[in-house]
Amino acid sequence: SGKDKIKLQKKKKASVVVAAKKAGSAKVQAKVGKKKYVCKVVVKAKTVKNGTSAGTKTTNKPADTKNATKNPSNGQNNAATQPTNNPSKDNPSKDNPANPTATPAADSDVPKKNEQDVKKLQALIQTLNQKGADISANLDDESVYHWNKEGRLTEIYWGEKKIIGAEMADFNEFTALEILDINNNNISGTFYVGDLANLKELKCYGNKIDKLVLDTNKNLQELDCHNNQISNTIRLNDSKNLERLYCSNNKITELDVSGCDKLQDVDCSNNLMSSLNVSDLPSLKSLNCSRNMLKDDNLILTGSIGLINLDCSLNGTNYDFINLNLAGFTKLESLNCSEQPEDGGTSADDTMEFDISACTGLKTLNCSYCSIETLDVSNLSNLETIDASGCNLSEITLDGAVKLSSLNINCNEITDLHIPETNEIKTLDCSESLGIETINFAVLTKLESLDVSDSYVPELDFSICPDLQVLNAMNTGFGNPDATTDNEDLPNIDIDLKSNAKLKDIDMSMVNVNVLTLPENDIVANLSASNSAVTQIVNLEKQLGLETLNIAGTGISALDLSANTNLKQVSCTESQKTGITGVDESIIYIVPDDSDDGEDGNEDGDDGEDGNEDGDVELE
């Protein structure tokens, strides 16, 4: 048809008319996540100049009347003035109405609408519009209504129509209704969904409904009622065909999905549930029950071993996630049990070991800000990402996690971080880990991002990390100090980054470094060495793509930046400004100079060791 790109609107329908050899129609539907897209295609038959349809055989050229008169024996005397193609079933023409392809009606496939449905729908539209709604009264608008072959109303799309005062009883007489979408209106009160036996999808999210009752909706496949004020128990045990349930951001205290064997996706996050039983649901793939009030070990998953994604984070002080039984959950790929308070159901005297060894298919683990002392992922050969930041970890075992590419263990108490020689780690965050004494950095040959800020680490040979792109070493003490050593007592060293040809962002603020050598190419975009011992930056003139530079509080007093034509901001102290040349003064940002205020800080009370709190300009 040439119309291979048809724009489909969100939760709406579109239609298009095309020409082809044969007439007909079709409805194309697609779902992307929770969104539904529908397009009706009407096909008209192509016609040619003589009025026949494309692909229809035409007759021979009419006989020559002159020759026919001279030779009557050919049998075409008077008939020669007419075409030889007489209209028939096998030889159609524009004058033959029996031919279905000759002049197809655009609406030939559209059935007559059910009179009762039309009458009730028109009355409901009028009533709601009188209350301030903005609902289309065009019953042929396929972005709003859909009718089946019997003329019954099967789909209503009234999302964001300013509806006030609608009740479920208003829709119960549309007994053929399969999809009802009334999202983001101002509907309040109780919603009883009982008489619509054919209803498959109900989307009433973004309203003010405080009670939702679904008793006999056995054909319901999707319920989306998130962002309401629902406070009652949601019972769906009779909805045996339910596949998707989204009821987050309500006040639900209990959820009954027992027997929903087809249920695949559940999001009941941010409610008031103290227990949740989703056991023996063989089709369940995704469960988000975060931000509830689950107590003890009242999240029951037994038998739902097809689960792929589980989020049970942020569940209050009484939730004992440590005892979460995940035995047999070999298909689980993503687990988020983060941000559980320290007294999360486990006494301080217990050994807090999180056992996930049975989850052999796990790819992503987030157990950040939980009370875990030891973490063993050696059996998880598919694990790619670990976020164990902010825990009480003293030990983590990584042997066997051969696909691990991202490791975040900042703010822990690990003293010895052993990384397997065979690893795929590209991102490592061990910042704010003052207790780390040994890290075998030599095996991190694929590292792209490293954060060792606010830590003490051994001297690093950065040449082993040729793919390094981001380096954050702010307030890091390089050397082998004990945990009581102050950065000022560490000997100054030189840092050589010339082998790191992919390094884009460097933060060497507040470090004991004298000479900082940059890569020889022009890849670095952001560089900060503020309040450090740096007196020289080698290869700075080669950084043609440099955008931000912070040398405030360093030992650098003179700097020619004429080669760095892409600079957008240079941060320095007032005393350093006079030594900076080659850039426009408009991009120079003055950081208050501590030396002007004496040992006790300035008059405004910024009396820390590093001077004004605003002295550091963070890299974007």
Regions found by a protein language model. Give the residues of each.
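N-terminal capping/linker segments that flank leucine-rich repeat
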Residues: 28, 93-179, 186, 197, ...
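Canonical leucine-rich repeat
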Residues: 166-169, 190-191, 212, 233-234, ...
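Extracytoplasmic soluble-region selector
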Residues: 1-74, 81-82, 87-90, 95
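Asparagine/serine/threonine-enriched low-complexity, disordered tracts
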Residues: 50, 60-61, 67-99, 103, ...
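Intrinsically disordered, low-complexity Ser/Thr- and acidic-rich flexible linkers and loops
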Residues: 316-318, 340-351, 479-491
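Conserved hydrophobic beta-strand positions in leucine-rich repeat
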Residues: 156, 180-182, 202-204, 221-225, ...
